[in-house]
Amino acid sequence: KINHDESIDVDAIVADTPRATPAQVMSAITKDSVRRALFANREYVLQEDIDQAIQEQLVGMANPIEDMDPVLLRQVAYHESGHAIIQHYVMPDQRISRVSIVRRSSGTLGYMLPVDTVEMYGQPLRRIVGRIMVALAGHLAVKVFMGEFWTGATGDYNMARMEFRNLAVHGFFGPPVSELYRDVKELQFSDERVERIWVSLEEQIERMLVEHADEVEALTERLLERRDLSNKEVLEVLG
């Protein structure tokens, strides 16, 4: 039995772990959270110990950069805030489990982690479009609020391309679906249908970021202050 604070929210832990395997959850609770408590000279586990232990299982150990250039840190914060704002408004059926600008052992400088609140066995194509918007939002937020594009969005753009291919094989762009099923890599991004929708989504994202600029700025400042935000802390800013 693990000594723990009585205020631990089991429902929140369950809500934040649909992506985690039972082995990951067990390791996070029985080993990693206890290690964190011992390092803090405590004989009991707090909610934050479990939350951070689960994040370690999902995205890697925290490996913060002590002397990161403040401008670069702000860029990362704007990037993750952009993801979070668009996620909040475009994918309201998902829960933002965590937003962080703490570098992880996986190499990522920051992340926004959404999780499904119900089991998904099928979905409307608009959810795929929503995921594309979320993927593109970080890079666009940096441009909108810092005046220029930065590096750091390679993974996001790979995700967007993958989701566009996902749309294609489900008939979003019309024919020739059969050819795409044989080799989805043949989807050409010079295709006018794809380019038109891609540009349209970018324009829509930029409008939303400007419309919610106060929330972007507030979330960015909160990230710079705390570095790592839980679902509750994100919603304190976004409502």
List the model feature ranges, each with a label.
Residues 1-49, 135-143, 170-179:
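Conserved C-terminal "switch" segment of AAA+ ATPases
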Residues 73-77, 84-239:
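Soluble catalytic regions of large protease machineries
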Residues 14-17, 29, 54, 103, ...:
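A general structural motif at alpha-helix termini
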Residues 36, 43-88:
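Conserved catalytic-core segments of large NTP-driven translation/proteostasis enzymes
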Residues 3, 18, 30, 34, ...:
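Signal for well-folded cores of large energy- and translation-related assemblies
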Residues 14-16, 67, 187:
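A short, mixed-charge helix-start or loop-turn motif at secondary-structure junctions
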